[in-house]
Curated annotation (Swiss-Prot):
Residues annotated with N-acetylmethionine modification: M1
Known partners and oligomeric status: Component of ribosome-associated complex (RAC), a heterodimer composed of Hsp70/DnaK-type chaperone HSPA14 and Hsp40/DnaJ-type chaperone DNAJC2. Interacts (via ZRF1-UBD region) with ID1.
Record region (ZRF1-UBD): 160-250
Gene3D superfamilies named in the record: DnaJ domain, Homeodomain-like, Ribosome-associated complex head domain
Protein localization: Nucleus; Cytoplasm, Cytosol
Post-translational modification: Phosphorylated in M (mitotic) phase.
Domain called J: residue spans: 88-161
Name of the protein in question: DnaJ homolog subfamily C member 2
GO terms assigned for molecular function: chromatin binding; histone binding; Hsp70 protein binding; ribosome binding; ubiquitin-modified histone reader activity
Organism per entry: Rattus norvegicus (Rat)
InterPro entries: DnaJ_domain, DnaJ_domain_CS, Homeodomain-like_sf, J_dom_sf, Myb_dom, RAC_head, RAC_head_sf, SANT/Myb
């Protein structure tokens, strides 16, 4: 069963009562306005409410058509039908005040009104003169309707609407009243857009997103405006196909040129607006301020990061310093402990040595003869120098707990062992010296008598001269040879070649041979200066390393500090050497004076040797 909606206002609904007779089968075809509305909704896939809106829209258009008042075109009767293309079609139909906003219904109604008023038959009946054929001005009305009733032709005419203002405001015009100048311009140019919902220019309170969307739209403006209406040649008038193609080509080129000019006009409009827009300036200033703020924030972050890194570095340095101080303190404590142990050992060995001397003295050195006692005293001193603490303690225990004969036997046995050890050491040293001499003779090739018979004094003098004249001295080896010839007590004259050969042979010596040379030099020094061995002057395991004035050699840094102090405090300075000693940490006044004297002697020796070399070279010339 088909259910129809209720009737609208002003319409009635007829109710048919059911008959009591039997029902019969019949065919019914749907008709009427309700069925028409149903078919429209089904074809458009729309609801009832949509159809109601469509009906209301049609009713509103009809009411607007009824309210539309046509404007009489005063120049209508003077128009030339042959020049219909240059006429204003909207004005001819009385729609000059509506123009492109006029609907097709309005155009049709306006044409109907103009036909009823200006048709030649009606005017002829009224007694007005009529021109024959297409020469009558009514032809202009017909042409106007033909152009405006066709959507394609109407768009072509709208594109070149003679009343449209194509002007573009200059920058100077919009400096003070930007929105008042540019808002109507963009409003009227928005009619050419293919896209609907054209964004508005807005005002000073518009957001950045709205302004950016506005200029993005207009910089990418998609215009439907075309200029086919201005074609100078009509292809319909062509006599052949080639002529028609040529006309089409000319028209396309002209349209493209005008389209390009139109897009340039739009671009100029947008550029002028963008350059004058106060919002753009405001946004740029805000962006600049934002960047400056971000820059300051980054700089502050970098500064804090740098401070954190510096703080961490200082903490690490402090930790390293504390660790180093702790390590140095541990080393110092160990050194102090070792020193204490060494002092204890020195005291113990000193005590044992004194005990050994007293024990031997109590036994009258185990001899009644004066010469034997002196010899025994020397042997006892030798034992004190050579024996270690354990051996001394063992020997003292024997002497304290035994008789004279047993003590003498133990003492003599210990003396024999020490003498045997010294004899072996001397033999080994002599063997090394002989081997060193042979190697030196081989290295020098046995040249000259000057390369032989190097005494211990000459060797020590050579070592001293090599240290005195370092590498880089002019004619170094000649200077060293002259220095040795002046200061040597052997009387042997040495040449530069002899000195070089011996220096090379000394460099090849092993450490034991160097120790032997130093030991012999020190033994000779003791004999010459009468230095008696002291019981507490050396540790049990110490060996003689040769004569040394300072216990600690001077470092390069100490030498620089001494030289600077000598320059800072001249000779006339009161308490000069005390101040110099204060400027050199770790050195006493005596150390500084002794080092100064050594430097003076070295400088004098260098000058003397160099003068001799210079004099010898002059004599040879």
């Amino acid at each position: 069963m088909l259910l129809l909606p209720s009737a609208a206002e002003g319409q009635g609904t007829a109710i048919t009562h059911a008959l009591t007779s039997a029902s019969a089968v019949c065919q019914v075809e749907p008709v009427g306005r309700w069925f028409e509305a149903f078919v429209k909704r089904r074809n458009r896939n729309a609801s009832t409410s949509f159809q109601e809106l469509e009906d209301k829209k049609e009713l509103s258009e009809e009411s607007e058509d009824e309210e539309l008042q046509l404007e009489e075109f005063p120049m209508l009767k003077t128009l030339d039908p042959k020049d219909w293309k240059n006429q204003d079609h909207y004005a001819v139909l009385g729609l000059g005040h509506v123009r492109y906003k006029a609907t097709q219904r309005q155009i049709k109604a306006a044409h109907k009104t103009m036909v009823l008023k200006h048709h030649p038959d009606k005017r002829k009946a009224a007694g007005e003169p009529i021109k024959e054929g297409d020469n009558d001005y009514f032809t202009c009305i017909t042409k106007a309707y033909e152009m405006l009733s066709d959507p394609v032709k109407r768009r072509a005419f709208n594109s070149v609407d003679p009343t449209f203002d194509n002007s573009v405001p200059s920058k100077s015009e919009a400096k003070e009243n930007f929105f008042q100048v540019f808002s109507p311009v963009f409003e009227r140019n928005s009619r050419w857009s293919n896209k609907k919902n054209v964004p508005k220019l807005g005002d000073m309170n518009s957001s950045f997103e709205d302004v950016d969307a506005f200029y993005s739209f207009w910089y990418n403006f998609d215009s439907w405006r075309e200029f086919s209406y201005l074609d100078e040649e009509e292809k319909e008038k062509a006599e052949c196909r080639d002529e028609r193609k040529w006309i089409e080509k000319q028209n396309r080129a002209t349209r493209a040129q005008r389209k390009k000019e139109e897009m340039n006009r739009i671009r100029t409009l947008v550029d002028n607006a963008y350059s004058c827009d106060p919002r753009i300036k405001k946004f740029k200033e805000e962006g600049k301020a934002k960047k400056e703020a971000e820059k300051r924030a980054k700089a502050e972050a970098r500064r804090k990061e740098q401070e954190a890194k510096e703080k961490q570095r200082q903490a690490e340095l402090e930790a390293v310093r504390l660790a180093k101080e702790k390590e140095e303190e541990e080393v110092r404590q160990q050194a102090l402990l070792a020193k204490k142990e060494k002092e204890i050992q020195k005291k113990a060995i000193k005590k044992e040595r004194q005990k050994l001397r007293n024990s031997c003295k109590n036994w009258n050195h185990f001899s009644d003869n004066e010469a034997d006692r002196v010899k025994m005293m020397e042997e006892v001193e030798k034992l004190c120098d050579r024996l270690e603490l354990a051996s001394l303690q063992c020997l003292n225990e024997i002497l304290a707990s035994s008789t004279r004969e047993v003590g003498k036997a133990a003492l003599e046995k210990q003396i024999e062992e020490v003498n045997e050890l010294m004899r072996k050491e001397k033999e080994e040293a002599d063997a090394r010296m002989r081997q060193a001499s042979k190697n030196a003779e081989k290295s020098t090739g046995g040249s000259g008598s000057g390369s032989k018979n190097w005494s211990e004094d000459d060797l020590q003098l050579l070592i001293k001269a090599v240290n005195l004249f370092p590498a880089g001295t002019n004619s170094r080896w000649e200077v060293i040879a002259n220095y040795m010839n002046i200061h040597s007590s052997s009387g042997v004259k040495r040449t530069a070649k002899d000195v070089i050969g011996k220096a090379k042979s000394l460099q090849k010596l092993d450490p034991h041979q160097k120790d032997d040379i130093n030991k012999k030099a020190f033994d000779k020094f003791k004999k010459e200066h009468g230095v008696a061995p002291q019981a507490d002057s050396a540790a049990p395991s110490e060996r003689f390393e040769g004569p040394c004035i300072d216990s600690i050699p001077w470092t390069t840094e100490e030498q620089k500090l001494l030289e600077q102090a000598l320059k800072t405090y001249p000779v006339n300075t009161p308490e000069r050497w005390e101040k110099i000693a204060e400027a050199v940490p770790g050195r006493t006044k005596k150390d500084c004076m002794r080092r100064y004297k050594e430097l003076v002697e070295m400088v004098k020796a260098k000058k003397a040797a160099q003068e001799q070399v210079l004099n010898a070279s002059r004599a040879r010339k």
